[in-house]
Design a protein with these regions (language model features):
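N-terminal helix-turn-helix DNA-binding module of bacterial transcription factors
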Residues: 1-84
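Short beta-strand segments enriched in small/hydrophobic residues
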Residues: 35, 40-45, 79-95, 193, ...
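Short, solvent-exposed amphipathic alpha-helices that sit
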Residues: 60, 98-112, 186-190, 212-231, ...
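Hydrophobic alpha-helical segments within soluble ligand-binding/sensing domains
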Residues: 177-204, 219, 223, 227, ...
């Protein structure tokens, strides 16, 4: 027997199933207040300014919060306090794996303190740095951690700056809290290590100049040579930008200059790994023909063959 004809004005049968609304309304501050026998203002004070509420009252409020499952609106509270609970980590090159390791350490500390972290890419661009600083000034974030090699002159002239901390870099002339390693001493130690292996012709692949961190590592390289009684040769120093391609280009530059070298100290692991790749492409073995030392101790240092000897830089 066929199906009964459907009246012309009736809607087609639905193929979807109606879902029963099983959502439960979130508990409100009023419910907490009722259960605790206090006003909503007292509940708010007990949660945001507990030192201003009597211990017994605070205890009743917390018991009511637990019983109802009430979750305080952190966003609204932060708005009242003009706080975002957000920190920006601004790095010079977001593609460098070293900064991802730093981010992990910063985020771990931030989460423990109730903050979240956003990561920004400066790209050595003054305008981008200014925009990130203005984000903090306009209260889109509570503070800025700077890991860039420059500070725009326009910012340096400002009489008041938002909360800024400089990390692992050095920005001379600025009165800003700074957390950094001793780049000069670390570079000096790297060259001393190579000199003790018997090397006398030690090349240096430097970072971009006049970046303060690059200068520190370059000067540490020169100090290490002096300690070993080695005369510095300007032709053995090549400037790079901390990236892999710069390491490869540095080997091509050194070879084009026709200089002899048996060891290389690179101002970053990425440049060191790039140099190792170019040396292999030119038929030279690492470390039998040329010893290479990097700086940073990124994951890549362990991934290459042979493993890269490098200066460890703490991330946390």
């Amino acid at each position: 027997m066929g199906a009964l004809p459907r009246p012309a004005d009736s809607p087609p049968p639905s193929r979807s199933l109606a879902l029963q609304d099983t959502s439960i309304a979130a508990p409100t501050i009023a419910e907490v207040a009722r259960l605790a026998g206090v006003s909503t203002a007292t509940v708010s004070r007990a949660l945001t300014q507990p030192d201003k509420v009597k211990a017994r009252t605070r205890e009743r409020v917390l018991e009511a919060v637990a019983a109802t499952g009430f979750i305080p609106n952190a966003q609204a509270r932060n708005l009242r306090l003009q706080a975002t609970r957000t920190v920006i980590l601004l790095v010079r090159d977001i593609s460098n794996p070293f900064y991802l390791e730093i981010y992990k350490g910063v985020e771990e500390a931030a989460i423990d303190a109730g903050y979240k972290v956003l990561m920004g890419d400066a790209r050595d661009d003054d305008e981008r740095i200014l925009r990130y600083v203005d984000m903090v000034r306009e209260r889109h974030a509570d503070g800025l951690i700077l890991m860039v090699g420059r500070f725009p002159e326009a910012l340096a002239r400002r009489s008041r700056l938002p909360p800024i901390v400089v990390a692992l870099e050095m920005l001379p002339g600025l009165d800003l809290p700074t957390v950094k390693v001793d780049n000069h001493a670390a570079a000096r130690a790297a060259v001393t290590h190579l000199a003790r292996l018997g090397h006398r012709r030690i090349a240096h692949i430097a970072g971009p100049m006049p970046d303060p961190m690059s200068l520190d590592r370059r000067d540490g390289y020169l100090a290490g040579l002096a300690d070993a009684g080695i005369t510095a040769d300007p032709d053995l120093v090549v400037e790079g930008d901390f990236g892999l391609a710069a390491g490869r280009a540095a080997i091509r530059t050194l070879d084009a200059r026709g200089v002899d070298y048996s060891a290389i100290f690179a101002a970053s692991d990425q440049m060191a790994v790039g140099a190792m790749g170019e040396l292999r492409a030119r038929g030279r073995n690492v470390p039998d023909d040329v010893s290479v030392v990097g700086f940073d101790d990124i994951v890549l240092a362990e991934a290459v063959e042979p493993q890269l000897t490098t200066i460890h830089q703490p991330r946390r």
